[in-house]
């Protein structure tokens, strides 16, 4: 007997936990467990205004998105953002639920230029990440 996929399944509503949808051995889960991301806030606090301007993008998210791009060999920030829109593991890693809007790809260039130009913040942040990851079973950090 032939079975047909019902189009109705596309419109079903399910109550899901994103944490359960990301495998326990997923690379991003392992990295997230290995790193205490709060160190980034201390490094960048003098680059943000606390009183004026529009709400900023979370600096941890600003670092995690290019990390996803690098780890998964995505060629451009524009494509990275498109991938994040549909990838549950990426959203989980970034702390976004399925309805949260993914930042526009141009947000990154603007933030990097305005906040991090002429600094070594990225080097400090990624050195810290590599050090933290080196203590996990991802010891081949030389390849990162």
Regions found by a protein language model. Name each.
Residues 26, 63-65, 80, 104-108, ...:
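Short, conserved catalytic/metal-binding motifs centered on acidic residues
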Residues 15, 24-28, 37, 41, ...:
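Alpha-helix initiation and N-capping motif
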Residues 136-143:
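Conserved small/polar residues in nucleotide/adenosyl-binding loops
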Residues 1-36:
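Charged, often Cys/His-bearing segments associated with DNA-binding zinc-finger transcription factors
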Residues 29-67:
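Basic, short loop/linker segments at the boundary and entry of helix-turn-helix/winged-helix-like folds
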Residues 9-12, 42-45, 105-108:
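Short acidic (Asp/Glu) and glycine-rich catalytic loops that position anionic groups and cofactors
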Residues 21, 30, 34, 43, ...:
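Residues that form generic nucleotide/phosphate-binding pockets
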Residues 48-56, 70-128, 132-134:
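Basic, low-complexity intrinsically disordered segments
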